[in-house]
Amino acid sequence: MPADLKSLLHPADTRILLVVMDGLGGYADAGRGSELEESATPNLDRMASAGSCGLLEPVGPGITPGSGPAHLGLFGYDPFEFVLGRGALSAAGLEVELKPGDVAARANLATLDDQGRVTDRRAGRPSNDEATEAVRLLREGVHIDGIEVTFAHEAQHRVLVVLRGEGLSPQLTDTDPQATGVAPLVARARTPEADRAAEVVAELDRQSRQALADQPRANCLLLRGFDSHQELPSMADRYGLNPAAVAVYPMYRGLARLVGMDVLGPAADLSAQVTLLSDTWTHHDYFFLHHKGPDSAGEDGDFGAKVTAIEQLDAVMPDLLALEPDVVVVTGDHATPSQMAAHSWHAVPALMWGPRVGRDPVSTFGENACLGGALGRRPAADLMTIMLGASGRLAKYGA
């Protein structure tokens, strides 16, 4: 953010809508377009033809981002300046208070074979009932001397783990190998101050495997994103906005909460999200709507399911446009190509629509089409100031 941006902030009776399709980006291969390019998206195509398009680099060229830094960039926070671990995000999403000295981690319920190798990093995406039972077993079976261990279920395979005790540091490497066919990693201390925490995590791993030994799928925990309590400057302070978030998954609700958004809901699905946003439209001037479906399908390697998830978002766009936002941006936080079944470094398509945005030659919303758009190829963190300008919220700079 430019150092003098705050001096340019200009009050305006305008509203901004940021729609994030998680994992939207992909790429074409073997005579087939990306998932977005193969989707039937008449509403998004009309918006693209009437607005401006481009490609966003979530963190930097060639860098594969996690969801946390990718979203921070979209909110106008430099991901290299504001570094958040997944544990802190999950804790904020579940409204679990982290005290000074606590260490939080995001954990996946996962499946190990008889040789101790990971066969499924997400334990087959268990139902909430199945995952809740696994968390109950963990609470009953894990007891570490001098350490208070908290387990909280987030959604499906996602679990929050919080460690509280003397001498703990979050400066640890992950135990999640981010791959199958290999054993979980051993948490290593990045600094001498984290030696005690590494010992605690090793004991946590041992006891959690024992507690889950009889579970057919969710029989271990993979931990990543160790972090402690975090505070970020609010969007109200940085950008003069009164922002709100409509998200289903706790982690994204937590990230929104950390940057000072009013977190609405909960809402169970996309339809409920749109209704909730509509009902609160006059209460805020910036809305973040998060749609998880494309990312989940991409991570499962399911091209068709990702297409369906994109088309579901397209179908609700008329309801959102009926609210008459002054600026709408539709984009993704990162790419999750189904060919890779994982996050990737690819740039993410973005479209901006509104009366002050202007029109470029792009007529369809897709990766290759967006290459020729007026927004160009730029860091995702640039997006916030462009939205502020397009909504009449920045005064002229200089004489």
What are these regions (language model features)?
Residues 1-399:
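Feature captures the catalytic ectodomains and active-site-proximal regions of enzymes
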